[in-house]
Amino acid sequence: VAGGGYIWHTTGSGKTLTSFKTAQLATKLDYIDKVLFVVDRKDLDYQTMKEYDRFEKGAANSNTSTAVLKRQLEDDNAKIIITTIQKLATFIKKNAGHSIFDKRVVIIFDECHRSQFGDMHQAITKYFKKYNLFGFTGTPIFAVNAGVSKNPTLRTTEQAFGDQLHTYTIVDAINDKNVLPFRVDYIKTMDAEPDIDDKE
């Protein structure tokens, strides 16, 4: 866990609560200066902040711009910061010599399977000197479903974050009655012409 890793928890199983507790516990470690919780969309930024506030009012800080993010990174009282991948990317690009890059930072990515993570991963490893990287996902990318990537060393979730630290799959959640079971029905809606090539 010292270097990081990823947590595979199915949708609806409480990933946000787990990530909040992870962020909260990290801030209690004397040697951790900041915890960044990174989401990939603005609506998730707002949603995560609302959830975190529900767990503990005022425990986390969100931001509306890169300038606000910069102020929060410089504020010793702002321990947990929720931001978007876009704001963090802009901050890194515009503040190459910033003091945060020399501090001990835990960076937690929500939905760490997203495609734009590759560029952010390179920026983090280039600028941050002392970081721990964790990812939460309901749909990890494995070698068998990785597809093509600009960076072949970051094709899978494991390549980007390290070891899988915990798993709670849809089967686990259904068995525990934490999510409802579902059934897939395939319905044939029309008969295909036998001599039509699907590739056409």
Where are these regions (language model features)?
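Conserved RecA-like ASCE ATPase "motif II neighborhood" in helicase/translocase motors
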Residues: 80-123
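Pre-Walker A (Motif I) flank of P-loop NTPase domains
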Residues: 1-5, 33, 78-79
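Walker A/P-loop
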Residues: 2-22
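Interdomain helical connector at the RecA1-RecA2 junction of SF1/SF2 helicase-like NTPases
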Residues: 146-200
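Conserved helicase ATPase motor motifs in RecA-like P-loop NTPase domains
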Residues: 10-11, 113-115, 127-146, 177
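Conserved RecA-like ASCE P-loop NTPase motor core of nucleic-acid helicases/translocases
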Residues: 8-9, 33-41
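Conserved motor-coupling elements within RecA-like helicase/translocase cores
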Residues: 54, 67-81, 98-99
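Conserved helix-turn-beta segment of the N-terminal RecA-like "Helicase ATP-binding" lobe
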Residues: 27-28, 42-66
